[in-house]
């Protein structure tokens, strides 16, 4: 999972303060569902997921994406205890929803892509390195309840 340096924490927190959680969340989850279509099976109740435009415009996708990134915002405040922060969500996704833990890694990588698109030149290789470490840590924490 890796240890977060003070520089990592500052880099992650600084960029996070500029993220529009609603826009980035909807785009991140939407892209996950388009790029990795097998993930759609966890979102049967979301209605029309028949095409990229249907997915990207789907209000339930946008709302859940916002919820996901809001949860991530809580983790950013607790980078030294990601496992504790995500204990309940890990249990839910493992025991009740049966989500493949690999999907957490995929979602993290899609988020990094979205941040790169949104922030352009500001999303330097150093910023990306800190964010990759963070999304890997979150994916690991969310996978911690799996047997």
Swiss-Prot record:
<dbReference type="GO" id="GO:0005833">
    <property type="term" value="C:hemoglobin complex"/>
</dbReference>
<dbReference type="GO" id="GO:0042744">
    <property type="term" value="P:hydrogen peroxide catabolic process"/>
</dbReference>
<keyword id="KW-0007">Acetylation</keyword>
<keyword id="KW-0702">S-nitrosylation</keyword>
<comment type="similarity">
    <text>Belongs to the globin family.</text>
</comment>
<dbReference type="GO" id="GO:0031838">
    <property type="term" value="C:haptoglobin-hemoglobin complex"/>
</dbReference>
<feature type="binding site" description="distal binding residue">
    <location>
        <position position="64"/>
    </location>
    <ligand>
        <name>heme b</name>
    </ligand>
</feature>
<keyword id="KW-0561">Oxygen transport</keyword>
<feature type="modified residue" description="N-acetylglycine">
    <location>
        <position position="2"/>
    </location>
</feature>
<feature type="modified residue" description="N6-acetyllysine">
    <location>
        <position position="83"/>
    </location>
</feature>
<comment type="subunit">
    <text>Heterotetramer of two alpha chains and two gamma chains in fetal hemoglobin (Hb F).</text>
</comment>
<feature type="domain" description="Globin">
    <location>
        <begin position="3"/>
        <end position="147"/>
    </location>
</feature>
<keyword id="KW-0479">Metal-binding</keyword>
<dbReference type="GO" id="GO:0019825">
    <property type="term" value="F:oxygen binding"/>
</dbReference>
<keyword id="KW-0597">Phosphoprotein</keyword>
<feature type="binding site" description="proximal binding residue">
    <location>
        <position position="93"/>
    </location>
    <ligand>
        <name>heme b</name>
    </ligand>
</feature>
<protein>
    <recommendedName>
        <fullName>Hemoglobin subunit gamma-1</fullName>
    </recommendedName>
</protein>
<dbReference type="GO" id="GO:0043177">
    <property type="term" value="F:organic acid binding"/>
</dbReference>
<dbReference type="GO" id="GO:0005344">
    <property type="term" value="F:oxygen carrier activity"/>
</dbReference>
<dbReference type="GO" id="GO:0004601">
    <property type="term" value="F:peroxidase activity"/>
</dbReference>
<feature type="modified residue" description="Phosphothreonine">
    <location>
        <position position="13"/>
    </location>
</feature>
<dbReference type="InterPro" id="IPR012292">
    <property type="entry name" value="Globin/Proto"/>
</dbReference>
<keyword id="KW-0408">Iron</keyword>
<feature type="modified residue" description="Phosphoserine">
    <location>
        <position position="51"/>
    </location>
</feature>
<feature type="modified residue" description="Phosphoserine">
    <location>
        <position position="45"/>
    </location>
</feature>
<comment type="function">
    <text>Gamma chains make up the fetal hemoglobin F, in combination with alpha chains.</text>
</comment>
<feature type="modified residue" description="N6-acetyllysine">
    <location>
        <position position="60"/>
    </location>
</feature>
<dbReference type="GO" id="GO:0031720">
    <property type="term" value="F:haptoglobin binding"/>
</dbReference>
<dbReference type="GO" id="GO:0031721">
    <property type="term" value="F:hemoglobin alpha binding"/>
</dbReference>
<keyword id="KW-0349">Heme</keyword>
<dbReference type="GO" id="GO:0072562">
    <property type="term" value="C:blood microparticle"/>
</dbReference>
<dbReference type="InterPro" id="IPR002337">
    <property type="entry name" value="Hemoglobin_b"/>
</dbReference>
<keyword id="KW-0813">Transport</keyword>
<dbReference type="InterPro" id="IPR009050">
    <property type="entry name" value="Globin-like_sf"/>
</dbReference>
<dbReference type="GO" id="GO:0020037">
    <property type="term" value="F:heme binding"/>
</dbReference>
<dbReference type="InterPro" id="IPR050056">
    <property type="entry name" value="Hemoglobin_oxygen_transport"/>
</dbReference>
<dbReference type="InterPro" id="IPR000971">
    <property type="entry name" value="Globin"/>
</dbReference>
<feature type="modified residue" description="Phosphoserine">
    <location>
        <position position="53"/>
    </location>
</feature>
<dbReference type="GO" id="GO:0046872">
    <property type="term" value="F:metal ion binding"/>
</dbReference>
<feature type="modified residue" description="Phosphoserine">
    <location>
        <position position="140"/>
    </location>
</feature>
<feature type="modified residue" description="S-nitrosocysteine">
    <location>
        <position position="94"/>
    </location>
</feature>
<dbReference type="Pfam" id="PF00042">
    <property type="entry name" value="Globin"/>
</dbReference>
